[in-house]
Structure formats: C-alpha cells, structure tokens
Amino acid sequence: DFNHEIKPNTQDIGFDYEFIIPATVDRVPCVFVENAHVVGLDPKDPITVNYNHKVGDWPTGLENPESVKMKPSQGHNNTIINGIPRIGWMTGGKSALWVDEDIADIITGKAKDFIISHKNEPFFLYMGTQDVHVPRVPHPRFAGKSGLGPRGDVILQLDWTVGEIMRTLDSLNIADNTIFVFCSDNGPVIDDGYQDQALELLNGHTPMKHYRGGKYSSFDAG
C-alpha cells in the first residue's frame, strides 16, 4: 500500500533516514519514497499497482506504442510513465511521478545533503544510483555527449555523480577520514529491454573485458 506509511521500511532495520525508489527504475510505481511515505502524493489520487494485470486506463506500451519515446526490445510494454513503458501497471499518484532525466540530480542532491548534515559525526551512507540500469535516460547535460548512445551517456552521468560525492567530502575536509566503497551488484548487460542502440553504438567498448558472461550469468562478468 503506497498510500500510507509503507511497512516494512528501512527504519525497521536500523536506518535513520531513507530516500529511495520502491523497485527498479523500469518498474512501477515510478515515485520516490522518503521515510516510508511517497513524496508528493496527493491523497485524493491514490496509487494502485499490479504486476499481474492492468489496472486503470493509463496508456501502455503494448496498446499505445505511438505514445512512447523509448521503445522496448523485450518486455517493458506495460504502463507508460514519462514516455517510457515499464514493467507492471499503475494508476494514480500523478503529482508524485518522477521524471527520469532528473533522477540522478535528485538522488545525488539528497546524498550531499545527508553528508553535509552529518559532517561532524560518524555516519554511514548507502547510495544506490539508478545508473546504468535501464531505462537509460540521461539528463540533457549528458545526452549525446559520450558518442556511445544513452548507455554511454548515463555512464558519464554516473561518473559525475561519484565526483559530486567526492567533491562534497573534500569540501568538508572529511575525505581523508571517510571510507568510500564503489561497487556494483552485477556485471554489465548491453541490451536490457529497450531499443537504446546500446549494441550498435559500443564503438569498440568491451564492457565484459576478457571475462565470460555478464549480468544474469554465474560467470566472472556476471
């Protein structure tokens, strides 16, 4: 139930503050959650979500392909949010819907604010960026800048995000007393469900390097 306090939540397992997305960015509901409540939700426009069947009358990628700005290559043909068809169906919560192009700025800003507010005490910050997960929709600052299509552009955006966090630590003179860990939950995947020309625009880039496999595999590159 996204219309009231969400249970369970990260405070239940020891976090003091949370600003998260409920699923992955290619899944509904496309909203932010702050301290167990959907950000900007109008109680008169409640959210309904279902992964088994359509709810509401919002356009879908399957029924309204003319309404999408990013076409699916596999799956990803359910409710259209911000011109992008997602996994699952939702309706309601219009005032709370995110704009994909702004997600990196918003999450990075929240992380910087957290660091600044805890600069005088020990803190633990877990920041999970949406890049380079699909849909790959960079902010206009990065769109078209990599020469490798949207996938390359969001890698640039991710690099900017990391730089912003590092610069914040440096500006507060706490970088030398901070352990910074950068890691991924899985290896690379090129075409992950949207027609974003990731394969066509690799331009010699080999994300897996000399390792076997990739995301969804049990080999080294997975």
Predicted segments, located by residue:
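Anion-binding catalytic surfaces of enzymes that hydrolyze or transfer phosphate/sulfate esters
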Residues: 66-137
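Catalytic-site neighborhoods of secreted/periplasmic enzymes
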Residues: 1-93, 209-212
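Active-site His/acidic residue clusters
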Residues: 28-29, 34-37, 109-154, 189, ...
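Conserved hydrophobic/aromatic pocket- or pore-lining residues that grip, position, or stack substrates
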Residues: 111, 127, 162, 180, ...
